[in-house]
Amino acid sequence: MAKKSLIQREMKRRILNRKYSSLRKFLREKIDKVSSLDERWKIRKNLQSLPRNSAPSRQRRRCFITGRSRANYRDFGLSRHLLREMAHSCLLPGITKSSW
């Protein structure tokens, strides 16, 4: 299981992303529309002044039960270990073990 501090840090990043996403989107659209180089630099400076952790590229997908950061399935939000356990225990509806 991941450290609690890592899980909390990821939650903080998710909250910051939601808070600043509309402003970030607005500034990016404004950069595309402006033709003056000086204006672009000013808008870029405003974009850089936003918190670093509010960028979506700083987020990492984690298992919502264990907090594991690697080998996650997007559809379930689970790591491969828990997905296997829960599928064998019939806790995930519609999931069957394949055989051919």
Swiss-Prot record:
Record has Ribosomal protein as a keyword: yes
What GO CC terms are in its UniProt record? plastid; small ribosomal subunit
Localization terms from the record: Plastid
- Entry annotated with the keyword Ribosomal protein: yes
- Tell me which UniProt keywords the record has, alphabetically: Plastid, Ribonucleoprotein, Ribosomal protein, RNA-binding, rRNA-binding
| Molecular function, one GO term | structural constituent of ribosome
Q: Show the InterPro entries listed in the entry.
A: Ribosomal_uS14 (IPR001209), Ribosomal_uS14_bac/plastid (IPR023036), Ribosomal_uS14_CS (IPR018271)
A Gene Ontology biological process term: translation
Family, per the entry?
Belongs to the universal ribosomal protein uS14 family.
Function according to Swiss-Prot or TrEMBL: Binds 16S rRNA, required for the assembly of 30S particles.
Q: Subunit notes for this chain?
A: Part of the 30S ribosomal subunit.
Task: Name the chain's protein.
Answer: Small ribosomal subunit protein uS14c
User: Which species does the entry assign this protein to?
Assistant: Aneura mirabilis
The top of its lineage is:
Eukaryota, Viridiplantae, Streptophyta, Embryophyta, Marchantiophyta
GN (gene name): rps14
